[in-house]
Amino acid sequence: MRDIVFVSPQLYLSSQEGWKSDSAKSGFIPILKNDLQRFQDSLKHIVDARNSLSETLLNSKDDGSIHNSDQNTGLNKDKEASIADNNSANKCATSSSRYQELKQFLPISLDQQIHTVSLQGVSSSFSRGQIESLLDHCLNLALTETQSNSALKVEAWSSFSSFLDTQDIFIRFSKVDEDEAFVNTLNYCKALFAFIRKLHEDFKIELHLDLNTKEYVEDRTGTIPSVKPEKASEFYSVFKNIEDQTDERNSKKEQLDDSSTQYKVDTNTLSDLPSDALDQLCKDIIEFRTKVVSIEKEKKMKSTYEESRRQRHQMQKVFDQIRKNHSGAKGSANTEEEDTNMEDEDEEDDTEDDLALEKRKEERDLEESNRRYEDMLHQLHSNTEPKIKSIRADIMSAENYEEHLEKNRSLYLKELLHLANDVHYDHHRSFKEQEERRDEEDRAKNGNAKELAPIQLSDGKAISAGKAAAITLPEGTVKSENYNADKNVSESSEHVKIKFDFKKAIDHSVESSSEDEGYRESELPPTKPSERSAAEDRLPFTADELNIRLTNLKESRYVDELVREFLGVYEDELVEYILENIRVNQSKQALLNELRETFDEDGETIADRLWSRKEFRLGT
């Protein structure tokens, strides 16, 4: 506080002595002592302007007495114009003398905060003089209707515009001894505005009170004054007159703006151009200039809007800082009180009763429980509820799994193709051929593992090891001898000698198996290989039945996926060609001949897959 001084710009401009104070006063704003000289310099040019204006008026009067009558006439006109401008400037200065910038208007005490109210919904087109005229008329009407002789007046006011068409007016009333006059005035103004809003929809002004002011008024409110309809009509007529003046001024301004765009091009400057091109050129010039003026208007409106947003953001920062400082002061005060209470407890522990200690302990426990509750509530909102929502979404997806799977079937098939689930098949088509070639090389080098060495029986007959393994051995057979026999067969080409009982069992099984094979061969009809391949090659369906089966095959998109698998892209024309070939020829060989031209060796694989589909099977 030692580095802060309180100053009043109004008193300084009126050259009064008490414009500076070390303590807070009504209408004074706090500044740093280091900024005092800067404050005086900023207001000094206003005083110099007033002095120069007075000297100009005096000099013009002296010059008027010297010149002749003709010159006096012209000078009188100039003096009248200058005097009129001076009077209008003085009126504006007088009418806006109670207006303060928003930073200077901020209340610095609780009394100023209580006596500050706001009007919302005031048109942004109202000038400062019109706003003060409206405020004075409203205040005089309220004091008259409430029959109050109080010296209540508007001490200062400011405005803040968050939109382009409306603004908020902040009003600070002077503090008077009669609180009843201030309370009755606010109640009457609030009732007056509400009554007019019910009658006229174009009247948007509303009185807004801060929380402290609202409680202050409610505690001191007796009977709410009634509003007479004729008084409301009188105030509304004043409001409409001000609004009409504003509309007239805006219309003149619009006409001036229109005149800046509606102009004629001087064709004399375009004399060197052909006459048939002048009309179009003039239109282009007017259109271009109109476009430029419109862009400038839009930029101006945008800058106005951005300025209002910036002011609003600045106000929000100021209010947040005030709130932060206020809460910080309260927190420091509470901390000091707690420290003081702890010291008092240590000093007066013997004298303080147990009831007060228990009460204080309960309060601390309550604060701790409230803090834990807030932490748990934050945990619920930040972690638990999002997890529950995610689990519910998973449950709903699981309940409708089949429907979801069927709906996105094509996407999943594409995902299987693009994400390379089968790496060797998708990216290495020759992998199967390489494996087959390696298997043949291994068989040529190491022999075929399926063709085991034959087992020589004791009676001179030979049987393969596979058949010998399939024979069920009788009970009592020596396992060790069988193990040695198998070992000898796998490791060397020596003949294995088997016991007589084992020989009998093997001979009996060989005879029975040969009889079964002969019986099966006798039952099967003789079929030529050419007839069998021809039957497999042709489709045994009628034309209508084949069309139905081809339609089902087309709807399953199996042929599309085959083409996509071997070509890498979808080809609808190729799919139609394949289906048409099957419909016309009904032959696997004819289809294979056509596919080899496009797919080479893969054509045989495609034909085999198509002929193995259920659509081409009998009984399906």
Curated annotation (Swiss-Prot):
Its biological purpose is as follows: Component of the U1 snRNP particle, which recognizes and binds the 5'-splice site of pre-mRNA. Together with other non-snRNP factors, U1 snRNP forms the spliceosomal commitment complex, that targets pre-mRNA to the splicing pathway.
Which residues are recorded with the post-translational modification Phosphoserine?
A: 512, 514
Q: Which InterPro entries match?
A: PWI_dom
Q: Name one GO cellular component term.
A: spliceosomal complex
Tell me, which GO biological process terms does this entry list? mRNA processing; RNA splicing
In this chain, composition skew of type Acidic residues spans: 335-355
Q: Where is the composition biased (Polar residues)?
A: 66-75, 258-270
- Keyword set for this entry? Coiled coil, Cytoplasm, mRNA processing, mRNA splicing, Nucleus, Phosphoprotein, Ribonucleoprotein, RNA-binding, Spliceosome
Main subcellular localisation:
cytoplasm
- Subcellular localization, as worded in the UniProt entry: Cytoplasm; Nucleus
Q: How does it assemble?
A: Component of the U1 snRNP particle, a subcomplex of the spliceosome.
| One Gene Ontology MF term | RNA binding
Question: What is the name listed in the Swiss-Prot or TrEMBL entry for this protein?
Answer: U1 small nuclear ribonucleoprotein component SNU71
Q: Which family does it belong to?
A: Belongs to the SNU71 family.
Gene3D superfamilies in alphabetical order: PWI domain (1.20.1390.10)
Where, if anywhere, are coiled coils annotated?
296-385
Q: According to the UniProt record, where is the region Disordered?
A: 58-82, 246-270, 323-373, 428-452, 509-537
Biased segments, Basic and acidic residues type: 246-256, 356-373, 431-445, 517-537
